[in-house]
Amino acid sequence: MGICISKPPTLDMHYRANNEHSENETASSSPSHSPTQEIDPYASSFSQLPPRASSKVRALADALRLANNINPELAHYAQRVLATVANSQPTREISNLDAKNLATLVRTYNAKYPGLNLQYARTPGEFRNALADSDEASWRSIAILHSQGSHRVAIDVRTHDDGHKSLLVMETAAAFKRDENDEALLQFGYSEFIEDLKYEFGSNASIAVIDVGAQKSHIGCQPFCFDFALNAFHKSDLFDDLHQRLHDHGQCSTRRDEAEFIDGTEYISGAKILPAVFYKHAESRATIDTVLREQPAIASKDVSTHRGGPAETLQERVRAFRIQRDEITYSMSIEASRIRKIREAIENDHG
């Protein structure tokens, strides 16, 4: 008999979107156009972007134009991102293309960073199968949270010496909110994801959720997940420590104000424990303000990952990528991150 977990009401957000719709829309099909057919009409609009973003966009356009024998689906992805970024926030079409090209990006970055061991799972069941089959000491996954949704989470996994598996789920937006009665409302999918994991693995696996909260838009969880997985890999000392505490003590937090417990699962405030780089692409200045209020010491931390480039703080980053669209002012840094990763795949993925 499975473990019985009481379910709090779920927070029914945009993540309830049907997964088939998300990944199989006809809008995501690859056209027969050559790369330059779709780039050139939008080139004049790139100058309207913040200078740093414009530079990354032009670099992608150049890479696409110069590429030989490029994967048609990857080329179409790049074309549509270039067409969209010049004029609007990411659309559902871009989100669909994110999903459709995830395998290519995963392959590219696994080759770039030996030991990253990044996987992806199209359903929660597919993730659980990978968890059961893997004996890797350290790996990561970008996984669908619920089989009837399209929202993804990044998961950092450790296999301990005794065979126990520990999972740190990184939520891009908000794993839960509280209603007017102060009752926890979990985001759609979390109750089922955790319950199914405990049913299948019982005491052989432990899980904690880190509420990062960098995403404020309704579309675009996958680029955040990708960055969180990379950050967890590069900050493995911190994550090793979190995993060990979860394994040894059943929780990661060392202070009462760092986390809340809902139905026995720990939900940790990322703003209170994560390094600055996890908020490099935060869309809202208010998010940065919260992080710096919780961790004043990281205000001067360099979040630049460009080798040999100038140092850059969180506040400098959000200013550099600030843009106004549809009466909304926000940082488009995560869009630049998507663009950089597509360019990496175009230049270095060989199938």
Positions of predicted regions on the chain:
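Contiguous terminal or domain-adjacent regions
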Residues: 237-351
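Cysteine protease-like catalytic core of ubiquitin/ubiquitin-like
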Residues: 133-237
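Exposed alpha-helical structural elements
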Residues: 101-104, 126, 189-192, 241, ...
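Long, domain-scale functional regions
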Residues: 38, 179, 183-200, 218-223, ...
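Cysteine protease catalytic domains with a Cys-His-Asp triad
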Residues: 2-154, 167
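Intrinsic-disorder/low-complexity loop/linker signature
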Residues: 114, 123, 163, 182, ...
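Intrinsic-disorder-associated interaction segments
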Residues: 46-53, 67-75, 95-99, 120, ...
